[in-house]
Structures are given as structure tokens and as C-alpha cells.
């Protein structure tokens, strides 16, 4: 099959035959945020027994780098910040006290629902924060969720509110999911498991 000019246009905006998972997009945004390094995705830091013994630790694996000039990355990062300040995500993040960078996405869906109605768009929002010293990359996709800003953008804001402890447009000390809104660098302390009581005779 030949790729037509229209297909190339679709690819450039993430539609048509473009297939991407939220996890993969998160990996891409993390690379943009950290200056271009692509890291292997991980869901665990270590395996720890109930008595606190560390069985195995997992070291982050560097997969490569984004092949582009630093000036291109700088331009992209500046553009992602403007999306949240003056662009399509400005409303979703209005008054947010932590600088967020990201991009809304609204992907058209072909077909109809069982009731005959047209399927709604797929809502996306991909981001990282804080803008100047990134700690998190957060991506949300909602099938038939409508516009990226009004559904996924609002949802991602709620996630950042928990991560940074934001209430009423202010960062509340002690309210963040992790202390000071920073992901932990050390393993948590695990107390020995409670021994089960013997059954009464």
C-alpha cells in the first residue's frame, strides 16, 4: 500500500494509522522533560520481604536519546509550556500554583455506537511538571471523552493536585501525596509481619 499525502498529514497530528499507548507517550514526554534521555519504563524499585529484607533492586535502564538538536528540544519545551499558559489547556490549569507543561489532544473516532449515535472523540492530555525542574510525567486518555482540554486536561489537573498537595489554588504543606511533592528516592521502612495467632484449643 502506498502512503498518500493525506496519510502523512494524519501522521503528523497523531491520527490515521498512528497507534500509541498512554504509557509510551508518557515515556516520550519524560524524555522531553529530562533533556532527551529515553528510560525503560519500570513499575517497581525493589522486591522487599515482610521482614524488611531487600530481595532485589531494579536499576533504571537507559535506552537511548532523542535524536534532535538541543535547540529543537528547547523550542518544544517552550511550546508545551505555552499550551498551558495561553493555549488550549489554559482553562484547565487556570490559577494552578505549579508550572505545568503539556499538550491537549482530540482524536477523531470513526464509527457509531450501538444506539446509532456517532462516536465521540478520544480525549488526550500529555504533560510533565514542574516545568523548570520536572519530577513527574502524567498522561491521560479517555475513550469518547470529547476534547482533550475539557476532559483529560481536567483529570490530569486533579492528579497534579494530589501529587503537589494543591487545594484552592495553593500548595498546602503536608497535603502532597509524597513529602514536598517529590517522589521518594529511598525504599520505605517495612515493619516485620505480625505473626498469626494460634487457634485456641
Where are these regions (language model features)?
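Intrinsically disordered, low-complexity mixed-charge segments
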Residues: 165-192
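Long, low-complexity, intrinsically disordered segments
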Residues: 191-201
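Active-site beta-strand/loop architecture of penicillin-binding DD-peptidases
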Residues: 1-64, 71, 77-170, 201
Amino acid at each position: 500500500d502506498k502512503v498518500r499525502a493525506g496519510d502523512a498529514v494524519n501522521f503528523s497530528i497523531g491520527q490515521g494509522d498512528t497507534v500509541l499507548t498512554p504509557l509510551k507517550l508518557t515515556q516520550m514526554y519524560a524524555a522531553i522533560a529530562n533533556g532527551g534521555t529515553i528510560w525503560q519504563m519500570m513499575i517497581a524499585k525493589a522486591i522487599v520481604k515482610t521482614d524488611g529484607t531487600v530481595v532485589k533492586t531494579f536499576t533504571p535502564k537507559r535506552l537511548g536519546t532523542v535524536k534532535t538538536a538541543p535547540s529543537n528540544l528547547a523550542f518544544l519545551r517552550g511550546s508545551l509550556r505555552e499550551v498551558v499558559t495561553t493555549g488550549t489547556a489554559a482553562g484547565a490549569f487556570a490559577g494552578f500554583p505549579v508550572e505545568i507543561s503539556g499538550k491537549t489532544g482530540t482524536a477523531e473516532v470513526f464509527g457509531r455506537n450501538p444506539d446509532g449515535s456517532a462516536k465521540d472523540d478520544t480525549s488526550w492530555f500529555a504533560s510533565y511538571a514542574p516545568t523548570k525542574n520536572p519530577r513527574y510525567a502524567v498522561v491521560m486518555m479517555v475513550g469518547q471523552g470529547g476534547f482533550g482540554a475539557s476532559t483529560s486536561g481536567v483529570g490530569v489537573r486533579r492528579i497534579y493536585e494530589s501529587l503537589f498537595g494543591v487545594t484552592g489554588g495553593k500548595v498546602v504543606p503536608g497535603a502532597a501525596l509524597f513529602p514536598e511533592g517529590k517522589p521518594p528516592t529511598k525504599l520505605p521502612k517495612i515493619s516485620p509481619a505480625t505473626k498469626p495467632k494460634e487457634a485456641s484449643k
